[in-house]
Amino acid sequence: MERFRLEKKLPGPDEEAVVDLGKTSSTVNTKFEKEELESHRAVYIGVHVPFSKESRRRHRHRGHKHHHRRRKDKESDKEDGRESPSYDTPSQRVQFILGTEDDDEEHIPHDLFTEMDELCYRDGEEYEWKETARWLKFEEDVEDGGDRWSKPYVATLSLHSLFELRSCILNGTVMLDMRASTLDEIADMVLDNMIASGQLDESIRENVREALLKRHHHQNEKRFTSRIPLVRSFADIGKKHSDPHLLERNGEGLSASRHSLRTGLSASNLSLRGESPLSLLLGHLLPSSRAGTPAGSRCTTPVPTPQNSPPSSPSISRLTSRSSQESQRQAPELLVSPASDDIPTVVIHPPEEDLEAALKGEEQKNEENVDLTPGILASPQSAPGNLDNSKSGEIKGNGSGGSRENSTVDFSKVDMNFMRKIPTGAEASNVLVGEVDFLERPIIAFVRLAPAVLLTGLTEVPVPTRFLFLLLGPAGKAPQYHEIGRSIATLMTDEIFHDVAYKAKDRNDLLSGIDEFLDQVTVLPPGEWDPSIRIEPPKSVPSQEKRKIPVFHNGSTPTLGETPKEAAHHAGPELQRTGRLFGGLILDIKRKAPFFLSDFKDALSLQCLASILFLYCACMSPVITFGGLLGEATEGRISAIESLFGASLTGIAYSLFAGQPLTILGSTGPVLVFEKILYKFCRDYQLSYLSLRTSIGLWTSFLCIVLVATDASSLVCYITRFTEEAFAALICIIFIYEALEKLFDLGETYAFNMHNNLDKLTSYSCVCTEPPNPSNETLAQWKKDNITAHNISWRNLTVSECKKLRGVFLGSACGHHGPYIPDVLFWCVILFFTTFFLSSFLKQFKTKRYFPTKVRSTISDFAVFLTIVIMVTIDYLVGVPSPKLHVPEKFEPTHPERGWIISPLGDNPWWTLLIAAIPALLCTILIFMDQQITAVIINRKEHKLKKGAGYHLDLLMVGVMLGVCSVMGLPWFVAATVLSISHVNSLKVESECSAPGEQPKFLGIREQRVTGLMIFILMGLSVFMTSVLKFIPMPVLYGVFLYMGVSSLKGIQLFDRIKLFGMPAKHQPDLIYLRYVPLWKVHIFTVIQLTCLVLLWVIKVSAAAVVFPMMVLALVFVRKLMDLCFTKRELSWLDDLMPESKKKKEDDKKKKEKEEAERMLQDDDDTVHLPFEGGSLLQIPVKALKYSPDKPVSVKISFEDEPRKKYVDAETSL
């Protein structure tokens, strides 16, 4: 009788795979379906139905067999004590599974490394498990003859092997959340379950166990046999190559392993304590038997089960094999057929609280006496060669079990280069397939460990194992077993099935994951594709998020890539108008202040040093050139030394206190044009140029502060990609144009003879002679120097002396401005283009195949600086006198009549202080547009900046420093677009550990203040570094300009659309906007943008360049007019959506909420189905529902089809 009661309580074959419920196993009446549905934010409709006989629908009696089938289906839907909701498709079930939120950390998905081992002969003598393939992201195979790993490739699977895998999961052993610490325990639990379910005959148990515990031979072992063993603790290697809290994050891995090990020890001592296993099992499975038992006399001995019992408890295994037999739905007959008509038994783990209580007293008795020989992380049978077992006998079972310090790994047999590619916190999935001669039919097992356990020697890298898949079968079908192993390994790398495997609660969840995967696969005809061809990994892997989105009841599916981008452009908090004086500035300071210290700590990287050296060389030349041009325009009032000092002072202050320190300040063309116009005006009206300029600068600074106070930077939200790209493209083109222009200007200075007669080279000469008709200026110069033309030996003068004395060059080797200079121009051309191509090549060196990853990454970071060093060295060795960078040697004002402090009034009339406000207004627009457009480009969302922007704080710093520079008589500096883009590009951060074959992922920008700060500090110290800087050839710096201009063009969508004009439709790239916008409209959008770009270019290079900022502002209005030609959806793909009025936003929001409500209530047949516990189904016509988002969500539903027209209250929770 006692045995009969036990069998009634043991699970039957209808219940699903072995699941360790942990602490919830003792909860009997928990409604799991409600808890899980609440986590999905589902819509609940509560219906109050009167209890009357008339309301019940009468069904025709269909016989006893029909009711028996209904009861069976209902029972089969209950899995692990929960009622599983019904689903129409596997995709819906998968979406439900992925939506569950588990409280424990054991079901949180981790990155997986999958390894497949096959059972094979070693040297024709004995079996061993040999590694044949591995997956981190893509598949890598061990080449048959080359004894090496193949290149990573996209795994191609046969459809038949996928169906065979599904049959394996359907008919094989599935054990979820197994608690085990060694491979021996795992093997014993799996084999016990197989014997209990009838899948394996007990007579061949030892043969299978011996095969499972064979040695594992990994591909990398041969390469490391000659290396001196380097034995360190696993904790040490974890600090560098893996997550230091890996095992703790995976559900307190070590402590759980120790707990499981103590459970096994306690279970093995049952006979010593004289307790009956049957009574213990009844004590756990029958709570009522303990109801009247005092706490003191309560059973404190843990219960061994097939999941946690060692092989010393066969009686328990035999007990669990007794279960009720019910017919199951026959699976398709493939390679693997069911072992019997019943699915393997479900075994319930005892509550974890009882196990801990049972062990409490036992630990106190055995703390000093128990000695664990195999240890926790080591199994002698699993890997005798991969462990240092000298200390295994010292690991005590004192409540702490083994520790990471005591568990050593022989790293002489670990491929550390591959270990670096494994993400932190990753876990392992082991696939074991093979053929043996003692099996008549295949045996299959899918095991999920909880927590993951480091089974040293099982995997080629020391990563904790989470999943195990076993397939052993009779000889003769090894290729089929191999393909099934590849199928499950490839499935584990699939993003969706990977998550399903972690969150699955039963076998049906795994089958749904496979079915969902089959729904997504593409079959290639065998006659049109050779499966042996290895597909190269794609540059970018498509997102799988659309597979996680539930399908609406009306059948439509909202895919992420096919919905227009409704989010407003620049909708972040940085550009929200506060309505308070200096409100935006205060928020910027609050936003950036917490990151101030990290802005300096985050610069501790070699990449920042490379960026400093690159940008220093790139900024020096334009600043000095701008100062030289300004000196020519102002007759030395402001020149190179003032430009260097102003750039250094402004840049240091901006880098320290600005909201976006990634922005680099520099000089701009419109500022130079403005300076020229102002100087000409002052000279014509005999005004003091520096004083009037100071007045204008102070007014401009004041107006910038007013813009900051009124949150005017919030207007930046109207600057969309249309304006950004036109402005950025123009600046890039100007950089390219000016670089080429400066190269051609060298042709005037270093002229060469294009009409040489090689036979008369000996007769060519060029001498200095007396000017035939000296000008009055020349005569005045001679008189001042107290010389006459007759006293000068003209033919003996050098070129510089001849030019100083205003002599004339005569001869066949003379040009218009002096003698021909051989080789210099051509050498400059060589330096120019070599610098450009070498910089581009070294920057892309990171993706080459030569040298280790670290070397390639360092070369790529220092690409421009290395190029400059190489070209300077070559120029020095060749010795051709190329033009060099000239830096002022003294720190003093260029003009002797000025100082470092300028009065705003000076010698000018008082009214000039008031009149200066008019040009200051134009200058303010210039500064505002240049600064904010550059800031918008830097703060683009594709740069993935994490510390936020600070538009108001940026403008404040520029305005304040503009006033300081005006008072000191220094040039004005504002954000430089190309330099800032180059600065951002030099600080890009990519993922360090990328799977073989996978492209590194862009993580963001290294946001810090040190690079900008050091660039401008070095610029200020350049006066003291002239002895080094004088060796830099100017053509090399021009080549750097060309490189910055060309590299900044990358990523500008305008140029991608320009290329479409010359491409036939079939050769056009798969650009996202070409899917949803007609091609002719794309061309119209491009033509409009290109026209605006040409107009900006014409204005920029003309005398009207001072109004250039006004034209940039006009682009915003042009973009606004484009709303008349394009739809909102088209503009969302081609450009960013412009902000709309507040009223229109509210109307659109209400309209969208209404559409969402209607879509959620709509079904294929316009009916809402409400299932009840008795199996009945209530159907509510949607047309009878009246819903309004503005009213309370309690409505009346009339059932017109019912005889008495009853009314039901429906409460909806949306």
From Swiss-Prot:
Residues 1127-1214 are annotated as: Essential for cell membrane localization and transport activity. Residues 1-12, 73-85, 563-572, 1144-1162 have a biased composition (Basic and acidic residues). It is a multi-pass membrane protein. The modification Phosphoserine is found at residues 52, 55, 84, 150, 233, 242, 382, 400, 403, 407, 556, 1176, 1213. This is Sodium bicarbonate cotransporter 3. Highly expressed in testis and spleen. Also expressed in retina, colon, small intestine, ovary, thymus, prostate, muscle, heart and kidney. It comes from Homo sapiens (Human). Transporter activity is regulated by CA2/carbonic anhydrase 2, cAMP and PKA. Insensitive to stilbene derivatives. Inhibited by 5-(N-ethyl-N-isopropyl)-amiloride (EIPA). InterPro entries: Band3_cytoplasmic_dom, HCO3_transpt-like_TM_dom, HCO3_transpt_euk, PTrfase/Anion_transptr. NCBIfam families: ae. The modification Phosphothreonine is found at residues 557, 1167. GO terms for molecular function: monoatomic anion transmembrane transporter activity; sodium:bicarbonate symporter activity; solute:inorganic anion antiporter activity. The PDZ-binding motif mediates interaction with the CFTR, NHERF1/EBP50 complex and probably with USH1C. Residues 379-392 have a biased composition (Polar residues). Its main location: membrane. SUPFAM superfamilies: Phoshotransferase/anion transport protein. Glycans are attached at residues 171, 269, 398, 406, 776, 786, 791.
